């Protein structure tokens, strides 16, 4: 089975993949100082929660935005004699039309790959994580950029840490915009205000993408993902076609399948390009030692 790993600033998310289907997923807090031993123990423990072990894993597909943990994951793969595919601008089987492709986060590229294959193009992915990321995919499947805003929980934390009297609050949908105490006022500002930020930026991005791609705005697929995408603040957004919390794991699965020549994935009709990343990926196996 394939082990898909999404290493974010807040969480490490694992997906256990059989064939091309995610059969289990787990999430743990990110520790940027983890050693190979610690990460191996974490992964092994999460696998055991679903009755699996490292002996069931045939390869690892990883997207990491934490450079320190990228190398640690590589060390774990070497130790376990597993093939490892690291998502990056160099391993993406799609055009990346931005000024500096190497600066684009691996998770953003993987999401762009997944949305094109699974939902069609043109498309916008909104990823609710530590940061909220908006990523655009052109009609031909190319990644063409996006926007990054502070994440919802980051805003809550900043209010608590950077002010003298504002408390940490629970993220919940307020009953009204006009709060009658500090907590309800903060919930209004954070949740309703955050939704307004998302909708406003999404509308502007959709308008620009529609103009560039010469399509009606209704043709642009909008997909939400990320650890906070299942919250009430996300469900209340207008103009969203799908909420897919496992989009990144699915993208890592697709990337692996393409790199290994899966006919089912390579023949996907949803975008204007097809092909394999084989030959450009960083693979570690027993033969390389």
Regions flagged by a language model, labelled:
Residues 54-65, 83-84, 213-227:
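Short glycine-rich phosphate-binding loop at a beta-alpha junction
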Residues 2-6, 59-61, 123-127, 221-223:
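Short glycine-aspartate micro-motif
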Residues 68, 90-91, 226-230:
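Short, polar loop motifs at secondary-structure junctions
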